[in-house]
Design a protein with these regions (language model features):
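Generic, ordered loop/turn and secondary-structure boundary motif
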Residues: 38, 84, 121, 146-148
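Aromatic-rich carbohydrate-recognition surfaces in CAZymes
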Residues: 46-50, 57-141
Length: 152
């Protein structure tokens, strides 16, 4: 596994590459075959940390693995544009956080800045559009946006 971080051949850059490579290995070890990235292997998954992890592997040059993370978001998105707050956990969870839903915009922009892939933006734009609509649906008459919705 090699990283496109630094082309310098000095001890400091080699040291940094090894640190980043360990970060990447850990994140990739937490990624399921369906693209979901859990907190730890065989642990919970929340959309916010999932997107954070996708951005981490973006920076480290793992484009296909990152795209797989967005595929997970796409396939697990609810019809109202949201995601549940937690996945792969024993307790039933019906909470849908508005900040989790809109955070896909940050992740997609980050991915684009790293890889300049407009096809990626076009592909996942419908998910982003739905997610933003869900977030805006939480806006109150005072202009603020409720933190979360519970489907119950």
């Amino acid at each position: 596994m090699s990283l496109p971080i630094s082309k310098k051949n000095n001890a400091k850059s080699i040291y940094n590459k090894n640190i980043y490579l360990n970060f990447a290995k850990y994140i990739l070890n937490c990624q399921d075959s369906d693209g979901g990235i859990r907190w730890e292997p065989s642990s919970k998954l929340d959309p916010w940390d999932h997107i954070e992890s996708a951005m981490g592997i973006d920076v480290l040059g793992f484009e296909s693995e990152s795209k797989k993370a967005y595929e997970w978001l796409e396939s697990n998105q609810e019809t109202d544009g949201s995601w549940y707050s937690l996945y792969h956990c024993p307790e039933t969870n019906f909470l849908k956080e508005t900040n989790f839903s809109s955070y896909i915009a940050v992740g997609m922009w980050h991915h684009y800045l790293n890889f300049k892939d407009k096809k990626f933006l076009r592909r996942f734009w419908p998910s982003l559009d739905l997610a933003i609509k869900f977030t805006l649906s939480g806006q109150t008459k005072y202009g603020d946006i409720s933190w979360a919705k519970d489907q119950e």
